[in-house]
Amino acid sequence: MAQSVPPGDIHTQPGSKIVFNAPYDDKHTYHINITNAGGRRIGWAIKTTNMKRLGVDPPCGVLDPKENVLMAVSCDTFDATREDINNDRITIEWTNTPDGAAKQFRREWFQGDGMVRRKNLPIEYNL
């Protein structure tokens, strides 16, 4: 049973943070490469702390071992002098898919008692 084994590692490029540069009167897009470094198929999903400002595409998916996906993180226009820009981040969550499951993302994989791993990527805004 896949859920009894902890999910393996993922690698992201960039590895530790996402940086958006001013001005913020135009939409910015930053690309992140996510690689499944483990030996099992995983389901992954992205969460953001600021749904109004930050968008992700695709927001979830399935990766076989050693497979990767290029994901776009977009930052919509905003007034950096009036809004709090200190605590934004995206969180990548991933878990092993059940044995024999189709390669189609299912939200319920994250709602059972299997282990879910997380990686936080803080957002840095250069003014």
Swiss-Prot record:
Keywords: Acetylation, Cell projection, Cytoplasm, Cytoskeleton. It comes from the Eukaryota. The keyword Chloroplast does not apply. The modification N-acetylalanine is found at A2. Pfam families: Motile_Sperm. It is found in: Cell projection, Pseudopodium; Cytoplasm, Cytoskeleton. Sperm. This is Major sperm protein 1. It comes from Onchocerca volvulus. The lineage of its organism: Eukaryota, Metazoa, Ecdysozoa, Nematoda, Chromadorea.
